[in-house]
A protein has these predicted regions:
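Residue-level signal for inorganic ion chemistry
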Residues: 56, 67, 94, 177, ...
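Mg2+-dependent phosphoryl-transfer enzymes with acidic/Ser/Thr/Gly-rich catalytic loops
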Residues: 25-29, 46, 213-313
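Active-site phosphate-binding/coordination module
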Residues: 47-148
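Hydrophobic packing residues within well-ordered alpha-helices of enzyme cores
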Residues: 49, 74-78, 190, 194, ...
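Asp-based phosphoryl-transfer active-site loop
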Residues: 28-41
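Conserved acidic, metal-coordinating active-site core of Asp-based
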Residues: 10, 123-242, 246, 254
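Short, structured coil segments at secondary-structure junctions
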Residues: 81, 86, 94, 198-200, ...
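Short, Lys/Arg-enriched N-terminal segments with co-localized hydrophobic residues
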Residues: 1-24
Length: 313
């Protein structure tokens, strides 16, 4: 009996080690907004958050960085989180593009019709707004001296290229264009006008008080995330989405578990299933530890497998 007991104990230990990564996972995809969510106010990933995200990836959860930033600006964060090693994804430009972090394959993409660029430039000039777009590791703009554009370039490690004739210089279909002004009322007025004028052609929204974003029609984080779920064969119930801003509301509502950061506006919190701590208080780590790490249960080991292993122990 003693030898049999030792044999069974040895078998259980062996099989638990063998199956340590085969855990029952309720959630398979973790979608994270970046600025104000993944990053603290110093634009850094905290040690606790980094450790938690590496842990859940080791457990089999795949991570999506979902941001308004350009793809190039998200790559250093993807590398830090080792998304390429764990089958993660980058959802950039607020949903205009999704790439596989492992091999750079574009899984989803929508771009602005270049024929719309002269119209956008005309409206920007008429209102005295700066205008820019992204291209690979550069920003193309008619206003390189603009403080907000310079900050955007620094944040994403991009070079600024000045082009006086913006629409003539942009000889490609951009994922999105940005109009920039400190006149918030004027930006709001153009946003309202364009929502009526461009309905069905382009979508516009303000991501910051000084930024008016122009993207292809029907593009947001949720719609693009839905396309990714189709590619992966996953259900929305298997998704956790975490965000802090108005641009994150649709993906928070789409996810099986939608989480708002503690510093979010009340309107964002109202759409969430759960409110975590702020980005200055490791809110992502708190959410992940509660929703994933503490909820995981070891996979069941079939009795016949246990008995078979016991016979050979």
């Amino acid at each position: 009996f003693y030898l049999f007991t030792l044999s069974v104990v040895h078998s259980i230990s062996y099989l638990c080690n063998l199956n340590q990564n085969r855990v029952i996972m309720k959630y398979k995809l973790l979608v994270l907004d970046v600025d104000g969510t993944l990053l603290n106010d110093a634009k850094e990933i905290s040690k606790r958050t980094l450790a938690a995200l590496l842990k859940v990836q080791q457990m089999g959860v795949r991570i999506v960085l979902a941001s308004g930033r350009p793809t190039y600006g998200l790559m250093p964060l993807a590398k830090m989180l080792e998304l390429g090693n764990y089958g993660g994804f980058i959802l950039s430009y607020n949903g205009c593009q999704i790439i596989n972090a492992q091999n750079g394959e574009i899984l989803f993409e929508r771009r602005i019709n270049p024929e719309m660029l002269p119209y956008l430039e005309k409206k920007a000039r008429k209102n005295g707004f700066a205008l820019f777009t992204y291209h690979d590791d550069t920003i193309i703009t008619d206003s390189p001296e603009n403080e907000h554009i310079q900050n955007e370039a620094r944040l994403n490690n991009l070079q600024i290229i000045k082009e006086e004739e913006f629409s003539a210089a942009v000889d490609f279909a951009p994922c999105k264009c940005m109009l920039v002004s400190d006149d918030e009322e004027a930006l709001l007025g153009l946003e309202d006008h364009w929502k009526r004028r461009l309905n069905g052609a382009l979508d516009v929204f303000r991501s910051e008080p000084y930024f008016l974003e122009v993207v292809p029609c029907a593009i947001d984080k949720a719609n693009s995330l839905g396309a990714l779920l189709e590619v992966l064969g996953m259900k929305r119930e298997e998704v956790i989405a975490v965000g802090d801003g108005v641009c994150d509301v649709t993906m928070i509502q789409l996810a099986g578990l939608g989480i708002a950061m503690g510093h979010s506006q009340d309107s964002v919190k109202a759409c969430a299933d759960y409110v975590t701590a702020s980005n200055e208080e490791d809110g992502v780590a708190v959410a992940v530890e509660k929703a994933i790490i503490s909820e995981v249960r070891a996979a069941e080991i079939p009795l016949d497998q246990l008995n078979a292993q016991a016979r050979h122990a």
